[in-house]
């Protein structure tokens, strides 16, 4: 009986500790930049984005981080260090991992896509190619 009471107290302590740890980690994330509030609202409107309260803060922070990367890249572009310009788009609230998962789906093994293809085929042997012709100079 004594062991089960100790186990219960330990479980309760563990649960409280994890809750405090999670709350601490959430508060450790930087707050959104208030100077970007209007731009964030305009971006959400332009791309018809809507989030629940729990997701809004996370998406905003991801968007801000991506915006900083885009601005740094474009500064390099202005100095001629890169050959293309970047801008915000409908994917700007996604992490690179989320973008890959959402846009590319699960990557398939190429063998699964075309399992019956031969390793080698002579295209001339089966008349898939026409004979070569003399080219005028």
Swiss-Prot record:
<feature type="region of interest" description="Disordered">
    <location>
        <begin position="114"/>
        <end position="137"/>
    </location>
</feature>
<dbReference type="InterPro" id="IPR038765">
    <property type="entry name" value="Papain-like_cys_pep_sf"/>
</dbReference>
<dbReference type="InterPro" id="IPR013201">
    <property type="entry name" value="Prot_inhib_I29"/>
</dbReference>
<dbReference type="GO" id="GO:0005576">
    <property type="term" value="C:extracellular region"/>
</dbReference>
<feature type="region of interest" description="2 X 3 AA tandem repeats of E-W-K">
    <location>
        <begin position="39"/>
        <end position="44"/>
    </location>
</feature>
<comment type="function">
    <text>Not known, expressed in activated T-cell.</text>
</comment>
<protein>
    <recommendedName>
        <fullName>Protein CTLA-2-alpha</fullName>
    </recommendedName>
</protein>
<feature type="repeat" description="2">
    <location>
        <begin position="42"/>
        <end position="44"/>
    </location>
</feature>
<dbReference type="GO" id="GO:0050728">
    <property type="term" value="P:negative regulation of inflammatory response"/>
</dbReference>
<comment type="similarity">
    <text>To the propeptide regions of cysteine proteases.</text>
</comment>
<keyword id="KW-0732">Signal</keyword>
<dbReference type="GO" id="GO:0010955">
    <property type="term" value="P:negative regulation of protein processing"/>
</dbReference>
<dbReference type="GO" id="GO:0045589">
    <property type="term" value="P:regulation of regulatory T cell differentiation"/>
</dbReference>
<dbReference type="GO" id="GO:0030425">
    <property type="term" value="C:dendrite"/>
</dbReference>
<keyword id="KW-0677">Repeat</keyword>
<dbReference type="Pfam" id="PF08246">
    <property type="entry name" value="Inhibitor_I29"/>
</dbReference>
<keyword id="KW-0964">Secreted</keyword>
<feature type="signal peptide">
    <location>
        <begin position="1"/>
        <end position="27"/>
    </location>
</feature>
<feature type="repeat" description="1">
    <location>
        <begin position="39"/>
        <end position="41"/>
    </location>
</feature>
């Amino acid at each position: 009986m004594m062991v089960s009471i100790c186990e219960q107290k330990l479980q309760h302590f563990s649960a409280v500790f994890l809750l405090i740890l999670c709350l601490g980690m959430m508060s450790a994330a930087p707050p959104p930049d208030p100077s970007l509030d209007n731009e964030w609202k305009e971006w959400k409107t332009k791309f018809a984005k809507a989030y629940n309260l729990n997701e809004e803060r996370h998406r905003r922070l991801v968007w801000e981080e991506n915006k900083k990367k885009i601005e740094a890249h474009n500064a390099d572009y202005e100095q001629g260090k890169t050959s293309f310009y970047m801008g915000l788009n409908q994917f700007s609230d996604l992490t690179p991992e989320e973008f890959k998962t959402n846009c590319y789906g699960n990557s398939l093994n190429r063998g699964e896509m075309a399992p019956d293809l031969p390793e080698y085929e002579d295209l001339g042997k089966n008349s898939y190619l026409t004979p070569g012709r003399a080219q005028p100079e």
